[in-house]
């Protein structure tokens, strides 16, 4: 192993093998006050968003956001594919192009893991309460996340460029360097992980724990405990902790914000890797200023995502967006959906409840035969969801309507859908043909 040599407090560090070398794990008191204030602002806004939205909206958006989170976390790694390719992969429709199929499998792996881990987290929260979020800081939890992310991938997908293999859930057994940063020796990782858990799991609940979450994200990436997949694990870990504290309600995730300014995300992570920048930069081995800048950025990203979704879910604005989606369906897609469905659809969104089919048809103001065909078209196009062939209906969010319902939430999916619609509208291949033909 090649060792990076750096000058710290008149001592030369040949390699990282002791937990004191990645101090500070939290900012000192003078730097902490504004961070706690920002964390409090985030918590208040996130709590208000969750309280204002109904369970139905949370359920529908959660499914959509899993695909979006998968797209963005893989984009940060340079392993993303088109949103439509993700949708196909969820239907077990994989490309004949080997590299695209590999990226599709990575996307599905994240979606499956996020759903599974959220379910397990909710189960543990019901049984153990606050101890569950503390458990997420354990080596056991980290290896669980890594194992779930990679366990279903074929052998070829787990092979790195140097020929070595990633073992799902296994702490690395060799030294690694990531860019300019040489991670701790593999023999010392248990000690680093124990210290990481001790500090962050021991932080008091509230604003301090949110600040600790941001710091923990960097220090986890810095340790690089796995041979590969550390960024994916760190981002999923952050997502799950925010959910465990009841701050996301399935309505937002920091993963979108991290990827929206990917260069800044990576630059600040790297800057926080640096050694202390002088006598005024804290008392630890690593830069406190860099850690503070990273925490500020993470809190800003989360707050921005909360504010964005708060605007998107405003009931008044949604009426106009539903109307635009229905107008497009009527004039362009000609799917049988009619604009008279606006009133019952907006009612379902605003109340986050359900309507019997007869009541829904009555609210359209259409005759029974036309109302019935309209209802069927809405179900076929995914504007409505139901649990049975004759059951009540509820508001749903089809991906093709995303650009109308939640503009700019997932711009790449909007562009992808517009391209697909353009191909179909210009007399190109049918949608079923597009599903069979891999898209480059």
Regions found by a protein language model. Name each.
Residues 1-440:
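FIC/Doc superfamily catalytic core
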């Amino acid at each position: 192993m090649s060792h990076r040599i750096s000058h710290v407090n008149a001592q030369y560090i040949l390699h990282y093998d002791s937990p004191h070398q990645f101090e500070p794990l939290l900012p000192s008191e003078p730097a902490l006050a504004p961070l706690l204030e920002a964390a409090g602002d985030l918590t208040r806004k996130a709590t208000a968003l969750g309280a204002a939205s109904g369970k139905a909206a949370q359920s529908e958006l959660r499914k959509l956001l899993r695909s979006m989170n998968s797209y963005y976390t893989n984009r940060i790694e340079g392993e993303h594919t088109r949103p439509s390719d993700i949708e196909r992969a969820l239907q077990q429709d994989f490309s004949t192009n080997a590299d695209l199929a590999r990226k599709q499998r990575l996307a599905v792996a994240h979606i499956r893991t996020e759903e599974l881990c959220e379910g397990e987290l909710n189960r543990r929260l019901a049984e153990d309460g606050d101890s569950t979020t503390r458990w997420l800081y354990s080596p056991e939890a980290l290896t669980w996340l890594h194992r779930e992310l990679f366990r279903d991938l074929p052998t070829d997908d787990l092979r790195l460029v140097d020929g070595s293999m990633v073992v799902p859930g296994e702490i690395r057994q060799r030294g690694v360097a990531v860019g300019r940063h040489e991670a701790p020796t593999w023999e010392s990782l248990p000690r680093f992980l124990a210290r990481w858990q001790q500090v962050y799991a021991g932080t008091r609940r509230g604003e301090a724990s949110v600040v600790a979450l941001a710091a923990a994200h960097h220090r986890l990436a810095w340790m690089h405990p796995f041979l590969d997949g550390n960024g994916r694990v760190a981002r999923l870990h952050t997502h799950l902790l925010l959910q465990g504290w009841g701050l996301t309600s399935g309505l937002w995730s920091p993963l979108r914000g991290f990827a929206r300014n990917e260069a800044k995300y990576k630059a600040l992570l790297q800057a926080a890797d640096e050694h202390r920048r002088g006598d005024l930069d804290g008392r630890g081995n690593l830069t406190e200023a860099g850690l503070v800048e990273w925490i500020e950025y993470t809190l800003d990203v989360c707050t921005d995502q909360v504010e964005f979704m708060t605007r998107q879910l405003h009931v008044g604005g949604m009426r106009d967006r539903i109307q635009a989606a229905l107008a497009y369906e009527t004039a362009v897609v000609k799917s049988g959906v009619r604009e008279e469905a606006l009133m019952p659809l907006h009612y379902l969104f605003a109340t986050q409840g359900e309507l019997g089919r007869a009541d829904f048809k009555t609210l359209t103001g259409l005759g029974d035969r036309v109302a019935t065909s309209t209802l069927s078209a809405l179900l076929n196009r995914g504007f409505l969801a139901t649990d049975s062939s004759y059951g009540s209906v509820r508001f749903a969010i089809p991906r093709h309507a995303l650009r109308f319902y939640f503009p700019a939430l997932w711009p790449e999916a909007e562009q992808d859908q517009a391209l697909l619609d353009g191909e179909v509208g210009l007399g190109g291949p049918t949608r079923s043909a597009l599903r069979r033909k891999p898209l480059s």
